[in-house]
Amino acid sequence: MTGTGKTVTRVDLCEAVYQKVGLSRTESSAFVELVLKEITDCLERGETVKLSSFGSFMVRKKGQRIGRNPKTGTEVPISPRRVMVFKPSAILKQRINGQQGSGKMNGEASHEQLSAEPE
């Protein structure tokens, strides 16, 4: 999953888990889906999801405001809503800019680490 300009899909993530962790393809798919569902559920409840050395996903409330139709210029009310925001960590920012940060982003977990029961 390296290179520029490529869009990484769920299938790509599942394949990476399969290749690097050693789970079956079915288990890898279930694992990725479980992680994404947990993140989604937390955001639905208004919780912030903070992944160390990666970034934070959070929901922000936007109030009602007046916008403009770009074609006609007429004012249009925009309803209040919640939006999802991602704030990358300093380490992730450094990595995407080709700098080596002082922290580590460990993406290499063994099958034993992932399947270990929480204490």
UniProtKB/Swiss-Prot annotation:
Protein name as catalogued: Integration host factor subunit alpha
Region called Disordered, residue ranges: 96-119
GO BP term, pick one: regulation of translation
Family: Belongs to the bacterial histone-like protein family.
GO cellular component: cytosol
Function (record text): This protein is one of the two subunits of integration host factor, a specific DNA-binding protein that functions in genetic recombination as well as in transcriptional and translational control.
Domain of life of the native organism: Bacteria
SUPFAM superfamilies, A to Z: IHF-like DNA-binding proteins
Complex formation: Heterodimer of an alpha and a beta chain.
Gene3D superfamilies listed in its UniProt record: IHF-like DNA-binding proteins
Alphabetized GO MF terms: DNA binding; structural constituent of chromatin
Keyword entries, A-Z: DNA recombination, DNA-binding, Transcription, Transcription regulation, Translation regulation
Statement: the UniProt record of this protein carries the keyword Hydrolase: no
Gene name, Swiss-Prot/TrEMBL: ihfA
UniProt cross-references to CDD domains, sorted A to Z: IHF_A (cd13835)
SMART domains from the UniProt entry: BHL
Species the sequence originates in: Bradyrhizobium sp. (strain BTAi1 / ATCC BAA-1182)
